[in-house]
Amino acid sequence: MQKRVVVLLLDSFGIGASEDAKDFGDLGANTLGNIAKACFNNLADSNDRNGALKLPNLESLGLGLSALKATNELPLGFDSHPNLIGAYAYAQELSSAKDTISGHWEMMGAPILFEWGYFKDKNNSFPKEILDEIMHKTKIKGYLGNCHASGTEIIKDLGEKHLETLYPIFYTSADSVFQIAVHEEKFGLDKLYALCEEVFEILEPLKIARVIARSFIGTNKDNFKRTSNRKDYAIKPHKKLLFETFIEEKQGEVISIGKIADIYAHVGITQKFKAGSLMELCDVTLEQVKNAQNNSLIFTNFVHFDSDYGHRRDVIGYANALEYFDAYLKEILESLRENDLLILCADHGCDPSFKGTDHTREYIPVLMYHKDLQPTFLGRSETFADIGQSIAHFLGLSPLDYGKNLLNFKGQP
């Protein structure tokens, strides 16, 4: 029997502070819950939306009930007895970090049980010897930044100076990351990518998870805007991924949409589709759901929930994007084939109402739909790897080293 799996990952869509949130300074974080609360209290009204958060399709898959199980509180405005068509769980992260790579890798069988390298100092974040090596190897004449920063704020602060000097802007965050921002036209995209590749080679031995190229356009601080030509240079996964097993054992197709391929350092990816906006990600995903061959795993990362709304602490924008996605989800559900398994999940939290601009350590929703799947609560997962293990079980693959199968089809005991 030919099967397909569709994984829709809403980047940063946590559903409540996890049991170890205190260790990360994230007690009280609740991405879904706090957005729903703001909407319910009319604090997220705009020209595009108003009132309670309206996510009927996500609710039918068990989103609200998943949050209720995780936090003992139903998100405000949600139905305690929705017309449930999906099975649902919530998951605690096993990995030692709350970043994108840790969440994604764990999901596909490679949890991070070691410590990434970090640049913890808020200012003068990068050691002098590293900066000296970068300048020597890349031949750049100077740099700007060298601090923790929001990507949108730092180009406002330093973008004009960058245009004067053409020095790249270096910055980081609480994640294991080295980000480089340059003007796409004045500095050049190819030159940026080449710089990032060289910096990645320098930082890889230090277990810095990613070097990220961030280009922007505009003429001054009032109109600088990041482009969609982001590129992530990631360390290769330390364990075999579900993708590789699928290709080896079933000659499957692994279809990356958005930044999935970059996150997994292109390991086990057979097809790649880029998209520059939430609308484009939805369009490309729907197209692949309609047209991708059987024996495929379609995996989309909806990055804009995180990059445009979570990190920017934009509750209204996040709520509006969720409602847009939910409307598209109806079309995706209607386009599924007889033996498709749909999974919706997240990789961490990024509560737009929380202090700071960093990710938040939260439980994630695990929502599953298949025509023969019993619509019920699947329990608490102790690792995101339960998602990958469930996919392996569904596709008839060798089991992963981590995680348990959550699937319980109708007629099974």
Curated annotation (Swiss-Prot):
One of its GO terms (molecular function) is manganese ion binding. The keyword Methyltransferase does not apply. The gene is deoB. This is Phosphopentomutase. Belongs to the phosphopentomutase family. It comes from Helicobacter acinonychis (strain Sheeba). Isomerase that catalyzes the conversion of deoxy-ribose 1-phosphate (dRib-1-P) and ribose 1-phosphate (Rib-1-P) to deoxy-ribose 5-phosphate (dRib-5-P) and ribose 5-phosphate (Rib-5-P), respectively. Keywords: Cytoplasm, Isomerase, Manganese, Metal-binding. Its EC number is 5.4.2.7. Pathway: Carbohydrate degradation; 2-deoxy-D-ribose 1-phosphate degradation; D-glyceraldehyde 3-phosphate and acetaldehyde from 2-deoxy-alpha-D-ribose 1-phosphate: step 1/2. Mn(2+) 1 binds at D11, D347, H348. It is found in: Cytoplasm. One of its GO terms (cellular component) is cytosol. InterPro entries: Alkaline_phosphatase_core_sf, DeoB, Metalloenzyme, Phosphopentomutase_DeoB_cap_sf.
